[in-house]
């Protein structure tokens, strides 16, 4: 029987799938190790578990097939084999169907073809996730006729602060505090203000055509969907288009238009560790520095968690409603991505840009800052000091200057 | 400490789109630099499907901006990002972006050329893009590339053709 099982497993029909089991298991082990995702996906996993875990019926089918060399003396080892096999089968179904992670070529194919879909990233790397979003956005074809290629992405990032493309980072965040609390700093490709992410925050990104794009549209849908699910949520839209609950902001939005397409992406605070957020969105030395800059200034808002729903439930509900509401012909599929499999040069390039010092610290708007206790006014363009009362500071990197501010006086 | 997004309350009063089209708000402002740069005015003004305009003068100097239609759709500009002087930018490449209360919107180069000057007035006063997108709100002054004739560049449209595409937008 064990012979038969291994033959069966090695038959051409299954050998590929077994490799897939090992590959995806490996990827999952890695990702889980990296992000402790076990709990996070538990809901969805158990849903598919119920759907796909082979029942006793499957076992009896196997026993039927094995009747010819059925040997009662080997029953216990056979049962072990069967249960091992069933476990493999379960793993295959559970990962293979529920979360088949796209390869680079699969990703490219679906993104470049027309059509609507949902992508959920299983990575929690903010660099990968923003780069993936950028890739999908850039490579989605423009729909000149017929329905537009609506796409919906979900991703959850590890701790990070994300500033808008045209913001002065020094004025928005305190780099030293971010570092001490293990928050990465990213400058995103879209406009808007600064937001904080952690694993209790879900990011959704709705992509559509420039013509169909309307800033408040998708948040209105989300509010409708979630309130109909549970009226206790009492979600509402404020005049800026952000989602609020009892007057507190729970979601912040930013928008980008390029190449005849547009996206609206937003955060959704579900069970974020808000205590860790406090004090991070303030410039360093707030009492000593007076900032003046063009560019975009964040609007400070009181925030809270939605509560009641978990990140997984949020993703499941919004995906499901999106699939229903935006269906044109055929079901809208859900795909899964991670940074090990669903990656290509274009995504890597964008990750490199996002990670680069150049993009983080040496871009953004011009600004000037007055350091009161030192009586200095410093003007900065692209991260470099270009004008100052003290000549020896001109030409210095502002970042280095601020880090060692005491040594310059 | 500055903490509010700057707003320029220069938004158009609500006018029907039909009226906008008929009034040709997307025509070049004849009283401003992009038109007055040369005494005879621009030889050609062309439009892209992404709502940029380009006004080309006899000496191959061209001004680029975005149309009235586009700025109305974008809402109040809060920041204008422009390229560095001296940069050679090919047609279709990014020329910069305009961030408004609603979005960061990419601007594309209508035809090959090298940036000669940027409209530095927009650094402090991005709202000018909304007030006079077809005149004072010009973004970039550039020198067209050798042999570039905007009347033959694929994808560039006349005012009439451009405004026809807007009808189809709805």
Swiss-Prot record, chain A:
Chain sites annotated for binding ATP: 188, 193-196, 249
Any one of the GO BP annotations: protein modification process
GO cellular component: mitochondrion
Domain BPL/LPL catalytic residues, every copy: 146-330
Superkingdom per UniProt: Eukaryota
Pathway: Protein modification; protein lipoylation via exogenous pathway; protein N(6)-(lipoyl)lysine from lipoate: step 1/2; Protein modification; protein lipoylation via exogenous pathway; protein N(6)-(lipoyl)lysine from lipoate: step 2/2
Keywords: ATP-binding, Ligase, Nucleotide-binding
Pfam families given in the database record: LplA-B_cat
Residues annotated to bind (R)-lipoate: 249
Xref: InterPro entries: aa-tRNA-synth_II/BPL/LPL, BPL_LPL_catalytic, LipoylTrfase_LipoateP_Ligase
Presence of the UniProt keyword Ligase in the record: yes
E.C. designation(s): 6.3.1.20
Similarity comment: family membership: Belongs to the LplA family.
Quaternary data: Monomer.
Name listed for the protein in its UniProt record: Putative lipoate-protein ligase A
UniProtKB/Swiss-Prot annotation, chain B:
GO molecular function, a single term: lipoic acid binding
Keyword Calcium: no
Localization: Mitochondrion
Gene3D superfamilies linked to this entry: 2.40.50.100
Co-factor remark: Binds 1 lipoyl cofactor covalently.
Record flagged with keyword Ion transport: no
PROSITE patterns cross-referenced by the UniProt entry: BIOTINYL_LIPOYL, LIPOYL
GO cellular component terms given for this protein: glycine cleavage complex; mitochondrion
Source superkingdom: Eukaryota
Quaternary structure note: Component of the glycine decarboxylase complex (GDC), which is composed of four proteins: P, T, L and H.
Family to which this protein belongs: Belongs to the GcvH family.
Primary role: The glycine cleavage system (glycine decarboxylase complex) catalyzes the degradation of glycine. The H protein shuttles the methylamine group of glycine from the P protein to the T protein.
Name recorded for this polypeptide: Glycine cleavage system H protein, mitochondrial
Annotated organism of origin: Saccharomyces cerevisiae (strain ATCC 204508 / S288c)
Lineage of producing organism: Eukaryota, Fungi, Dikarya, Ascomycota, Saccharomycotina
């Amino acid at each position: 029987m064990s012979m038969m099982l291994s033959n069966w497993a090695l038959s051409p029909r299954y050998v590929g799938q077994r490799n897939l089991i090992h590959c995806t298991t490996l990827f999952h082990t890695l990702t889980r190790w990296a992000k402790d995702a076990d709990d996070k996906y538990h809901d969805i996993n158990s849903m598919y578990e119920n759907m796909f875990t082979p029942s006793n019926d499957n076992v009896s089918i196997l026993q039927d097939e094995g009747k010819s060399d059925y040997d009662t003396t080997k029953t216990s080892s056979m049962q072990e084999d069967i249960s091992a096999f069933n476990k493999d089968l379960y793993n295959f179904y559970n990962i293979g169907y529920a979360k088949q992670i796209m390869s680079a070529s699969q990703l490219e194919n679906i993104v470049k073809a027309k059509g609507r879909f949902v992508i959920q990233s299983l990575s929690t790397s903010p660099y990968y996730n923003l780069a993936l979003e950028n890739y999908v956005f850039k490579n989605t074809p423009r729909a000149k006729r017929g329905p537009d290629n609506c796409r919906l992405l979900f991703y959850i990032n590890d701790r990070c602060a994300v500033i808008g493309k045209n913001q002065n980072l020094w004025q928005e965040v305190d780099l030293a505090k971010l570092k001490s609390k293990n928050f990465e700093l990213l400058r995103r490709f879209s406009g808007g203000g600064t937001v904080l992410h952690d694993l209790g925050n879900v990011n959704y990104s709705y992509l559509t055509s420039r013509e169909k794009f309307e800033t408040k549209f998708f948040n209105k849908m989300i509010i409708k969907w979630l309130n109909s699910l549970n009226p206790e949520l009492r979600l509402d839209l404020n005049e800026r288009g952000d989602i609020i609950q009892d007057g507190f902001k729970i979601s912040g939005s930013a928008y980008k238009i390029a190449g005849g397409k547009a996206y609206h992406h937003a955060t959704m605070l579900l069970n974020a560790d808000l205590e860790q957020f406090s004090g991070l969105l303030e410039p360093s030395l707030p009492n000593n520095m007076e900032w003046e800059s063009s560019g975009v200034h964040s609007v400070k808002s009181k925030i809270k968690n939605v509560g009641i729903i978990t990140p997984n439930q949020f993703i499941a509900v919004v995906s499901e409603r999106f699939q229903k509401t935006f269906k044109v012909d055929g079901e809208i599929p859900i795909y899964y991505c991670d940074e090990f499999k669903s990656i290509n040069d274009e995504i890597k390039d964008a990750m490199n840009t996002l990670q680069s010092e150049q993009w983080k610290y040496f871009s953004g708007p011009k600004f000037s800052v007055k350091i009161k206790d030192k009586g200095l006014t410093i003007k900065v363009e692209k991260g470099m000091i270009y004008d100052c009362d003290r000549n020896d500071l001109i030409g210095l990197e502002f970042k280095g200057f601020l880090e060692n501010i005491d040594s310059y006086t | 400490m500055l903490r509010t997004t700057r707003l320029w309350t220069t938004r158009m009063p609500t006018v029907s789109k039909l009226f906008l089209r008929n009034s040709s708000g997307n025509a070049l402002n004849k009283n401003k630099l992009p038109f007055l740069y040369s005494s005879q005015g621009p030889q050609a003004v062309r439009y892209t499907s992404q709502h940029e305009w380009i006004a080309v003068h006899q000496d191959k100097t061209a001004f680029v901006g975005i149309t009235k239609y586009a700025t109305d759709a974008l809402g109040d500009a809060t920041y204008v990002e422009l390229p560095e002087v001296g940069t050679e930018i090919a047609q279709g490449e990014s020329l910069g972006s305009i961030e408004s209360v609603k979005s960061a919107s990419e601007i594309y180069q209508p035809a090959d050329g090298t940036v000669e000057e940027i409209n530095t007035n927009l650094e402090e006063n991005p709202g000018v893009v909304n007030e006079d997108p077809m005149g004072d709100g010009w973004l970039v002054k550039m020198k067209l590339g050798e042999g570039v004739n905007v009347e033959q560049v694929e994808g560039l449209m006349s005012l009439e053709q451009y405004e026809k595409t807007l009808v189809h937008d709805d």
